[in-house]
Amino acid sequence: MGVAVLIAIHLHIRLSAEVSPLWRTLSEYVNAGAAPIFGVMCLALAAGSLALLVGIARARRGGAVPVLLGLWCAGLVVCGLVPVDADGAARTLSGQLHNGGAVLAFLSLPLAGWLLTRRSDAHCPWEPRRTTIRRLSVASAVTLGVVLASFAWIMSTGPADPVVTLGLFERVLFAVDLALLLTMTRPLLSSARR
């Protein structure tokens, strides 16, 4: 996951003049000539998340949580491999697949976090972080709602001159989801050290 964060920082610094962090989504780095780097970022995040999924499976947490984390990973892989449509361009199948992968990923992660922290036994490694994971899951879901509403607003009013800072909202969502992933991962690292 650290690789994904470093790549995201690199993209922001290198391409801030071409892709406004306030107005443009992370995926639009693809259209600024950074498709391979963006793809590696998504795939690195998926790989780190897959490691979390394996840790959860080893902790004997079955049910919907591994499935939802698998969907998060699959959505990230789609985002990394299938390019988004250029701003203002006609909608294509690949662009729709990219958008669908993003929605799938961003819907799945907060649900996984919420379900991971259901009350179970006292030896659950996530119990000490239950409140934090739940709060981050809610923050992720609320921020996703803002992102989707912003996207719908832009699509209905025209993307040429957006009045909604979709890029900023998506970056907040990305940061919240990274915090959620790290908070979900930390108990596994702590129990592995024991």
Model-derived regions: residue spans:
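Alpha-helical transmembrane segments of multi-pass membrane proteins
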Residues: 2-20
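Hydrophobic residues within the alpha-helical transmembrane core of Major Facilitator Superfamily
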Residues: 9-11, 50, 77, 114, ...
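Interfacial segments of alpha-helical transmembrane regions
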Residues: 1, 60-71, 128-140
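Small-polar-interrupted transmembrane alpha-helices in polytopic inner-membrane proteins
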Residues: 67-80, 142-151
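Interfacial helix-start motif at the membrane-water boundary
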Residues: 28-47
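Membrane-interface interhelical loops and short amphipathic "cap" helices
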Residues: 17-32, 86-95, 157-166
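Membrane-proximal helix-loop-helix units in multi-pass membrane proteins
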Residues: 78-128
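Terminal transmembrane helical module of multi-pass membrane proteins
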Residues: 118-194
